[in-house]
Amino acid sequence: MTSENNPLRHTALFPSTTAVERWAIPGLILAFVMFYLLPLMSHGLWIPDETRYGQISQEMLLSGNWVAPHFMGIRYFEKPIAGYWMIAIGQAIFGDNLFGVRIASALSTGVSVWLTYLLARRLWNNPRINAASALLYMSFGLIAGQAGYANLDPQFTLWVNLSMVAVWFAIDNRTPRARLGGWALLGVACGMGLMTKGFLALLLPVLIALPYMLWQRRFGELVRYGLVAVVVCALVSLPWVLAVHYREPDFWRFFFWHEHIRRFAAGDDAQHARPWWFYLPLLFASTLPWALLLPSTLLRMWREKREAKMAYLALWFLLPLAFFSLSSGKLPTYIMPCLLPVALLMGQTVVKWLDQRSGRFLRLNGVFNTVLASVALVALLYLQATKEIYENTEMFSLSLAYIVVVGWIIANALQVLRPLTLWAMPALGIGLLVALLPAAMPAQIVNSKMPDQFIAEHQRELSETASLLSNDLGAASALAWRLKRPQVDLFNTIGELKYGLEDPAMEARKVTMDGVGQWMTEARKKGAVGVVLRVNSTQEEQEVELLPVDGKHYRRGNLHIFIFAQKQP
């Protein structure tokens, strides 16, 4: 009898299989609501990602153009359409607010947690492993942190996860009908992944399934049933693929070469260029607060690699990680699709330790996390005493920061004291962190990284203006989102809108330092003018000096808001 099927009951976290089956799913749902959903409205939109994706999706609702993405009315072809659809649907249902912008990321992560639970049940049919794997995945630092952040990575990760779960269900089923269902589901996931972030959604399932099926000597089955996935993927994605080509013939050329070829093969000139080993230390950080369990988990994976399900999980983890490491362009969130198999492997490892009543590695994990948080607490006390990073008016935010750090220490200390009965307590620590830390940010970070909060305080005055101007894409998109007005002209900045601004029709949207005086004169003839500037450099200070001196001026940190009244000729 294997240890995972051992009927031995002991006073671990899961006192009985029946209790796990009864409480695991309600407990995961409760944690999802408390740590993922409730904090969504507790802090402003981070720049540049959240304001960008919130504005692009809102613009779909305002313009009715659900085919070609536009950023503040300017062509923006760096991503396909489906991710914007989901964020737009969130805003359509819940309103143009923080919850509406972020709900797509939270729900995508929640579904990925559910997929973890389902696949664990399929692999081992052990309620304790099911619950442990889902809890671990839900509490990985990178996964939990992105769940409340409005970008496309949680959505893309969902579609990759669904693809790989569908492949396993397809190849593990005995009946042709069930296999067809699995391959068809793979096609749906690939089609949605393609429309969320591109051709990587098609590559990753092939990268994993092909060597696995060759190893299993089932290549013919892969070819026969794989055609079903190809057809379904085409049915899902082809209508939009053709529609965007018809409306914007240059979309696929730009998207393919800029977002795929350049990122993978451009070397040091690639966007977000990083060394090949970038993801190795990041993998450790991404799995906090469970990072010290990672070596033992991977060692067990290697020892059991000849077992079919372990080999599949190993390929799912290792091959995408190797592919992303070879790519020239790298961002931390790219490895999110690698983490679900890690959670499954780690969940099985933890339950085996509990069955064997071996808490050594769990205790070491708690010690590491406790020391880490203790260092963070000392650093916070020192910085507050010497630098006063929180002002006297920010005691509530400072209190939240202390709650986060002390809560992390207590949660992990409990794991140290009772590693078998309270092994899951680090999940509570990471839950407190992702729920409270964004709201605990000092004002200097809020003012710098969440400009929509300051803009919201002056929203009435800004909404009464006829023209808008900004020197920063993050501030401009926050302004456009808050006012529901995509038309924000760009003062001495281009950034990621370089491609869209090359359109001759967009020439009027670019305002140079030499031309801002004339632009202001013409704009004030039409009505009041609102200007939002971020001032971090000497050049940006010069931009402020070029503005008229007769306007209202509001300042918070490096963010400046000017309101200029209409001026008749």
Swiss-Prot record:
It catalyses: 4-amino-4-deoxy-alpha-L-arabinopyranosyl di-trans,octa-cis-undecaprenyl phosphate + lipid IVA = lipid IIA + di-trans,octa-cis-undecaprenyl phosphate. Coiled coil: none annotated. Its EC number is 2.4.2.43. It is an enzyme of class 2 (transferase). Its main location: membrane. One of its GO terms (cellular component) is plasma membrane. One of its GO terms (biological process) is response to iron(III) ion. Keywords: Cell inner membrane, Cell membrane, Glycosyltransferase, Lipid A biosynthesis, Lipid biosynthesis, Lipid metabolism, Lipopolysaccharide biosynthesis, Membrane, Transferase, Transmembrane, Transmembrane helix. It holds the Pfam family PMT. It is found in: Cell inner membrane. It is a multi-pass membrane protein. The chain crosses the membrane at residues 27-47, 98-120, 129-149, 151-171, 194-214, 225-245, 275-295, 311-331, 334-354, 366-386, 396-416, 420-440. Catalyzes the transfer of the L-Ara4N moiety of the glycolipid undecaprenyl phosphate-alpha-L-Ara4N to lipid A. The modified arabinose is attached to lipid A and is required for resistance to polymyxin and cationic antimicrobial peptides. Belongs to the glycosyltransferase 83 family. HAMAP family: ArnT_transfer (MF_01165). This is Undecaprenyl phosphate-alpha-4-amino-4-deoxy-L-arabinose arabinosyl transferase 1.
